[in-house]
Regions:
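Glycoside hydrolase catalytic-domain context in secreted enzymes
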Residues: 1-530
Length: 530
């Protein structure tokens, strides 16, 4: 075990893990042990692991200051371990770039310390990690810091898909590391086997939890209606029913804990929250353009098929066969669902649209999980054809704080890619001026949703990792074998003219040299011809 982490076992109950350096002490009640997370010497309901996640979340939400709730609503920008020296994901260590800082790969950056301790941020998005061991040690340092702050709320770390071999975009930036390798979602769909997808979910969840990751920013269940879209490979294809079946299996695999790992209702130490995306369907961008760019902000639904795009959500992610029942989080896409708002007639990005979130998602389809914006929607856009910058589609005329307020009033709980609490606090003041004390209740509503996803997976009891277990779990041979077998199963023979296949032995095969023209990567940086 890590020398700075103490484990306390409860007979027939939860095992506690805490760092003495955090100041947390152990309380006892009827022979059972509990963590005194707020250090007040009393066992409060949110500290009592015998109670339901819902009751604990409601108790804790009432105790939080508005500043602490605002911190829960933040979801960090992309973090790599260690931080990159330059570029979009850069960070510093005591003011220096990593190569010249003398820091360890698992040390916290200056920026991480600030957003955890000053902005009360508790949801962190990870990309590349130097090694599974470095990720585990980094997680333990993050959790020890969070445990010693305020009410002791642990960090809920997350990732975009990282089990593929290609890392070329912001939304797969963690792929290609020391982890089992599987087909992408489109390859999984080509197997037509939901059981295979559920097996992937179970294995991926085990690897994620060993890395300190408790939320997956996946599955991507957009219907691939335009082959020109550059994100088709991340979907389960063009068939809504197949996508629904795969979405259901994916979420069941990720979220379901079994046996000794289960805490309650299928949730537990083997669970990873699934954030299904992108509501209400992001695969119908005008002319195949993508809404990461200003030139691709519009989603069009020819033929009156808007509701068809809901099927992977309403018949899949919201109707799981497992005990967790539904995906615990959802991400609306950047797009403006053009002329689909039949109530308010607004053409604004989905996270800003009260009809899309409050009326459709919340009321009609009764979804009460976390809704988190896609990354950086509240910032200002700089260039139409550049990935970098905000994506305030349809609300460019509003201030940053007004955008936050509009998102909250639309029914969304969390802001992807936002590290600073100040705009949320400004939005809260706007709500107090317009609605009075109701605004506090609105903030608590989101806090409860966010906290439930942290309680359910056992992070309040033990957020710490055994580094040796991490090294022995992530990318272990049986997981690698399962991924390889899935790759074989995903292959589809499209054509075999003149019976070229199978190849006869002794044949010479010509493989032409690949040329790549000059261009720009997803961040807008130039790529030379090669």
């Amino acid at each position: 075990q890590n020398p700075d982490v103490v484990l306390v076992k409860n007979a027939g109950g939860q095992t506690l893990g805490y760092s003495p350096a955090s100041g947390v002490k152990i309380l006892t009640d009827n022979g059972l042990s509990f963590k005194d997370l707020n250090k007040n010497g009393a066992l409060d309901p949110y500290e009592d692991w015998r109670l339901s996640a819902d009751l604990r979340a409601r108790d804790l939400a009432e105790r939080l200051s508005i500043e602490q709730i605002a911190g829960l609503m933040l979801y960090s920008r992309h973090q790599s371990i260690p931080a990159r020296a330059d570029g979009y994901f850069a960070g510093t260590y005591k003011g220096k770039k990593f190569p010249e800082s003398g820091a360890k790969p698992d040390d916290l950056t200056d920026q991480q310390i600030v957003f955890l301790s000053q902005d009360n941020l508790r949801h962190v998005l990870l990309t590349t990690v130097q090694s599974p061991e470095a990720a585990a040690r980094w997680n333990n340092k993050v959790q020890a810091l969070c445990e010693g702050l305020g009410l002791g709320i642990p960090a809920n770390n997350s990732t975009d898909p990282r089990h593929g071999t290609v890392s070329t975009m912001e939304y797969n930036a963690g792929a290609g590391g020391q982890i089992s390798m599987w087909p992408g979602s489109l390859g999984m769909a080509a197997s037509f086997d939901p059981n295979l997808v559920e097996q992937f979910g179970q294995i991926a969840a085990a690897e994620y939890r060993a890395l300190g990751i408790a939320t997956a920013l996946s599955p991507q269940v957009d219907i691939a209606t335009d082959p020109r879209w550059n994100r088709v490979s991340g979907t389960f294809g063009e068939n809504p029913k197949l996508s629904a079946a795969m979405s259901q299996a994916y979420c069941d695999g990720f979220q379901t804990s079994k046996g000794s790992q289960e805490i309650k209702n299928g949730w537990g130490y083997g669970s990873v929250n699934a954030m299904v995306k992108h509501w209400p369907g992001g695969g119908s961008g005008e002319a195949g353009r993508d809404a990461h760019y200003g030139m691709g902000k519009f989603a069009v639904y020819p033929g009156g098929k808007f509701a068809t795009h809901f099927i992977p959500f309403t018949k899949g992610a919201f109707k799981l066969t497992g005990k967790t029942k539904m995906a615990s989080a959802i991400m609306p896409y950047y797009t403006i669902s053009w002329n689909q708002d039949t109530k308010n007639k607004e053409n604004v990005g989905n996270s800003y649209n009260s009809y899309i979130i409050n009326d459709l998602l919340r009321k009609k389809y009764k979804y009460d999980g976390v809704a988190c914006t896609d990354w950086s929607i509240t910032g200002n856009k700089t260039q139409m054809d550049n990935f970098v910058g905000g994506k305030p589609h349809g609300v460019e005329h509003l201030s940053v704080a007004q955008r936050h307020y509009k998102v909250l009033m639309a029914g969304v709980d969390q802001f992807g890619g936002n590290n600073e609490a100040a705009p949320i606090l400004e939005a809260y003041k706007m709500g107090m001026a317009e609605h009075g004390e109701w605004m506090r209740a609105r903030m608590e509503q989101s806090a409860v949703r966010l906290l439930k996803n942290i309680f359910r997976v056992g992070l309040f009891e033990n957020p710490y990792l055994d580094v040796e277990n991490t090294k022995n779990t992530v990318g272990k041979p049986e997981f690698m074998t399962a991924g390889y077998e899935a790759q074989l199963k995903s292959m589809v023979l499209l054509k075999n003219k003149n019976k070229v296949l199978p190849l006869k032995t002794g044949k010479t095969v010509y493989v032409p040299k690949k040329y790549t023209p000059a261009g720009r990567n997803f961040l807008g940086a130039p790529i030379p011809e090669k």
